Every structure is written in C-alpha cells, then in structure tokens.
Amino acid sequence: MTEGRPVKERTYEMESRYLSPYAKKSAETAGRAREEVPCAFRTDFQRDRDRIIYSNSFKRLKNKTQVFFAPEGDHYITRLTHTLDVAQIARAIARALSLNEDLAEAIALGHDLGHTPFGHVGERVLDKLSPSGFEHNVQSLRVVDVIEKDGRGLNLTAEVRDGILQHKSSGHPATLEGVAVSLADRIAYINHDIEDAIRAGILKDSDLPQNAVAVLGHATRERINTVITDIYLRSAGTDGVHMSENVADAMNELRSFMFRNIYSLTNKSMQDRAERMLTAMYGYFLRYPERLPEQYLALAENAPKEQIVCDYLSGMTDRYAIGVFEGLFIPETFSLGGVTV
C-alpha cells in the first residue's frame, strides 16, 4: 500500500525499483550549494526543472536566434524550440535506457540559457572580445549560479549544474543523463537546422550526403528515430550512452556538411551586422559601465567589468540587442520646420 505515503517517497521507491543501476537516483543527489527546506512532493531534480522553466533567461530563449537571423516564417527554430527538442529527445533516450528522465529534462532545459543573441555569431564575437574568452556552456552555468534571481542564482543541484556545463561534445558529464543530453543536443540541432535550411530554400533534400541519408533516413523523424534506436541497442544494460560507429560516422558526416554549406555561409551580411552591433555595444559599456542596468551593476562587486558586460550582452534577445544598439548609436529623427531630420 502506497496511497498514504508522501508523493516524493513513492517516486524514490519507483526509481530504486525500475531505474538502471547506472542511473542517477533522485534520492542520491549530491545536493545544492545552499541547503533548502525540501519539497514534500517534488524531487530535487523536478524542482530544478521547474526553476529553469520559470526563470527569465528561459523565457528569453524564444527570441534568440538558432541559425537564421530574424526569419520571416512562423516555423523556424529558435533557441526555445531547440531547447524543447533537446529535452524531448533526451527524455526519450533516458526512458529507453531506464535513466532518470527528470534529471535529463532539467539539464536539457538549462543547457542553452547562456547563449548569446544572433546564434553562434554572437558567441564568437564575445569570445574574441572578452579577455577571458566566452563559451555559452560556461555562461549557462553562470546564469543559473549567479545572474538569475537578482544575483542569488537558482541554486540547482550538482548533477544539473554538471550537465549544463559539460553538455558540449568535448565535455565529460558525470552522469549518464548528462551524456544523453549532450547527444540529444547534437541530434536536435543537426536535424532541425537541415529543416530550416530546406525551408529557407538554401538546401534541397537531394543536396544532403547520400551515404549519411542511407544510414539515417530521409525525413527528420526517420533520422531521429534511427539514432535513438541505435543508442538503445548499443547502450542498454551498459554503463555508457553510445552510438554505433556506423551511425556516429553518418551523424558526423551530416554535421560536417552543415558546417561547410550552412553555418559558415548563412546570410553573411546579417552576420557582419550582428558582429558590428555587439562589438560597438561591448566597447560602449566598457567605457560607461555605470549605464548598465542596475541588476548587472550589482554583480560588479564580485566580477570584472568585462564579465559584467558579457553577462548583459549575452542575456539579450536578438530584438532587444538591436533596440539597444539603435538607442545608443542611431540618431532619432525629429521635425525641424516641417522637415524630418
């Protein structure tokens, strides 16, 4: 009989009974940097997921570019839709391998919170400008640790923080759920970026490398299903999350194709404009840091001004960045004797 037991305790029992021995059980979390009163209903990983969803940084993802700047259609991918794709794929992998779905989902929802406006162009610009460099995964961790909640951060669990920091392909997550998110990120962005490129008229289906298509499938749903199925067959019952060599090679071939034909060529004029805007604003706020919003000024007590300027710029949406740039550098028109100046 479990009806009278606390909801969270029932969750712990179910995880102990049904999750893989290699999964991170919610009851085994290493905890938070600051102790908190436990929730009677939610596990710590479930609380992390909710905190991320309700954060301001998560809300702003809907107006941050994935690949195509300010697309005019309704169905192009943004950072928010990419994040939701990653969360769905990560949960599917976790479910197939009997891993902790709540942990995988929380990591996935937080993995891109520190991404810049204007996609990877913005990241490259800030990396070049900042003396300490800039990586969106490191900034995502700073968002949840420091920037959110007026400098208090979200106080997430160690496992979610690790997964956010280590989600890049070069990372080494401490949990299998973190590995699942890293793979899900790659699966998601390669496939939906192909969709966007075809939608924009830059690619045709027939342009894709046929060796990779033969392995993975023609349609997005086929490719995603092929990879998740392969991960399951390769990883079930083991202490890892892997693709087979054949499928991994096909994914890498698609990724290389996209870098050669899309990521390095997409709307060069817009990329140049984005670089000029971010460079100009970076220089302006370094010179006049007192003109930063108050919430960022408050962070300056514990970080150099270069970091605080990067905090502000990386947190902008595409539209907000354009608006701030115009407000700083584009003269307003006004009427003088009936003539607009």
PLM features per residue range, with description:
Residues 1-83, 87-93, 100-101, 133-341:
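Histidine-centered, transition-metal-coordinating active-site segments
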